[in-house]
Amino acid sequence: MRFFDKQIKAGDHLVTERLGYTHHGIYLGNNKVIHYSGLANGLRAGPVEITDLGTFSQGKRTYISHHSNRVFSHRQTVKRARSRLSEDKYNLLSNNCEHFVNWCIYDKARSPQVTKVAVGVASQVLLGNLSSGVVAFSIFNNIKNI
């Protein structure tokens, strides 16, 4: 595991790389992280759990995401995170590890990763439909002129 920040403190938002996405958790101190385990352990969605830092990062690059405009202090963030320990309501689109961390820090469950993917998919659908419409119009005009 590699860290690029000198000191991690309880309440810090940790981010670690995964294949195609990033995983998020809250550092509790004493080498422990609380996070929504989600699909980390296979196809079954897991609960909010406490794990050691090495297990959380799985040997991947891990860094602190700094929040200058956090609503809750580091101490309050830890308390909020612990209040959801064992919660088992993981949902990739509406209640994942990133939603969990942002709720702990801001009281707003949001996931910029999910938003980015949703916008990308919607754009592709719209562009695909637009392209299909142009092709259909072109074919219609060619048939009409025969």
Put a short name on every predicted segment:
Residues M1-I146:
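Cysteine-nucleophile amide-bond enzymes
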